[in-house]
Design a protein with these regions (language model features):
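Bacterial N-terminal signal peptides
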Residues: 9-19
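Surface-exposed interaction patches
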Residues: 161-164, 178, 183-270
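Bacterial N-terminal signal peptides that target proteins for export
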Residues: 2-10
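Mid-length scaffold segments of soluble, non-membrane domains
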Residues: 116-197
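Compositionally biased, low-complexity segments enriched in small residues
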Residues: 1-2, 15
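N-terminal targeting leaders of membrane proteins
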Residues: 25-134, 227-271
């Protein structure tokens, strides 16, 4: 049992430390697409006839926006942030990417989509509460309907019946966005160990969302961590290449990630 705990701790560190560098590119961007858009992006990533090249073109527009100073956020702990970025970057390429690539080669795309849908369904409380806090009552109501339909007819959320057959769409919101709608400023930039780019406001939001995320209450903790690793590896398997594309498009990847993250979060707050 002790060896199992040590092994899980090592895997957790290797996997989650690598996710931070790509989280904004994979989930914070693609994760906010509609179900039909997401299917197209998945098809493209699987080599099918889907549309899109992985990263949203709007994301690269963030680099141009920064030239006018629109996305400037203070970075007073630059050396710490850059060190965390470097660590996450290395662990992505040497741990998470190989693991996700092997997983992708073994597990068929339909099964991986089912796993992704399952974890997305689990985040219903976060979406519902934050839609409610933002006064988006219609979207909050839709979240309830989607959760009930997908949990029952969709078999624990593995199938997105509500999105495909009832034309209902989730409206992904988190506490960081909610704080933004209340005009709470972003604060300074942070590159968090394991979680990647953030701001002081988003970090506080992440801490608040922790308490309404069902996965954090799974017992025993080994199962919780195991599910977290599965979720991370599975999500990454759909987005291999996104982070690489961003890095290759910029002479300064650290700044590019910072600017793109900030612009993306601002657009999410405004929508």
């Amino acid at each position: 049992m002790k060896k199992t705990k040590i092994f899980l701790c090592i895997v957790w560190v290797l996997v989650f430390a690598g996710t931070g560098s790509i989280a904004w590119a994979a989930d914070a961007v693609a994760g906010y697409q509609t179900a039909s858009q997401q299917e197209n992006m998945d098809a493209a990533s699987e080599g099918d006839n889907g549309t899109g090249d992985g990263l949203d073109d709007d994301l690269f527009d963030a680099f141009e926006d920064d030239a006018s100073g629109k996305s400037r956020v203070a970075d007073p702990i630059y050396y710490f942030n850059y060190a965390m970025y470097t660590i996450n970057d290395r662990l992505y390429f040497y741990a998470l990417k190989p693991l996700a690539s092997g997983y992708k080669a073994i597990v068929p795309a339909p099964a991986r989509r089912g796993v992704r849908n399952f974890f997305h369904n689990l985040l219903f409380p976060v979406r519902f509460v934050n839609n409610l806090l933002q006064g988006k009552l219609h979207q909050a109501s839709d979240e309830i309907g989607i959760f009930i339909v997908n949990t029952t007819a969709g078999v624990a959320g593995f199938n997105q019946v509500a999105q495909k057959h009832l034309n209902l769409q989730t409206n992904t919101e988190d506490l960081g966005q909610t704080l933004g709608t209340y005009h709470i400023t972003e604060g300074f930039y942070l590159f968090l160990p394991f979680f990647g780019p953030s701001t002081l406001r988003d970090t506080l939001g992440r801490a608040g969302d922790y308490f309404i995320t069902p996965l954090n209450y799974v017992e025993p903790w080994e199962l919780e961590w195991g599910l977290g690793i599965l979720d991370t590896v599975n999500r990454t398997s759909f987005r291999i290449g996104d982070y690489e594309d961003l890095k290759s498009a910029s002479l300064d990847p650290y700044t590019a990630i910072k600017n793109a993250y900030i612009q993306n979060r601002r657009s999410q707050v405004k929508r």
